[in-house]
């Protein structure tokens, strides 16, 4: 458990890797999470290698002023508790490097110039408007140089 919100894209990557490496030892897991940029609670559960998670309309959304937290429970055998805890903590939403209006290069198969339109949009660190004829919008799933870079 930790206070604050997480980056759901980091969680998805971590869970995929965890299940690939240790899925046979994980019997069940479940949790309720605060995802940065979303008002709904993210509820998930899994059995062995089967993972299911979604933003829930059945559970009340985070109320204004409510302390946001992330809770995760694993049941299994021979689990590395410290590695599980660290992996979960590594999914915490990071402080972002860019602000609305900043010019960046966004990776859309190749790095292309764009402008940050919104921070923490639909659970993604950035929504970027690509500076081309279409002015298409893309989400940046993780704030690192693999996905988005400074123009400077």
Language-model segments: which ranges?
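Basic/aromatic-rich interaction segments and small domains that mediate binding to polyanionic partners
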Residues: 100-151
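P-loop NTP-binding site
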Residues: 1-99
């Amino acid at each position: 458990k930790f206070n604050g919100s997480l980056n759901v894209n980091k969680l998805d990557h971590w869970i995929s890797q965890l299940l690939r490496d240790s899925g046979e030892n994980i019997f069940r897991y479940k949790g309720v999470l605060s995802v940065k940029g979303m008002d709904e609670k993210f509820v998930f559960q899994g059995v062995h290698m089967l993972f299911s998670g979604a933003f829930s309309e059945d559970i009340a959304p985070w109320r204004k002023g409510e302390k946001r937290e992330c809770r995760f429970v694993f049941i299994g055998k021979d689990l590395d508790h410290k590695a599980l805890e660290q992996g979960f903590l590594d999914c915490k939403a990071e402080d972002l490097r860019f602000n609305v209006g900043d010019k960046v290069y966004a990776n859309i198969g190749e790095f292309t110039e764009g402008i940050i339109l919104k921070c923490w949009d639909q659970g993604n660190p950035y929504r970027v408007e690509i500076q081309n004829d279409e002015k298409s919008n893309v989400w940046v799933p993780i704030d690192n140089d693999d996905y988005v870079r400074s123009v400077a």
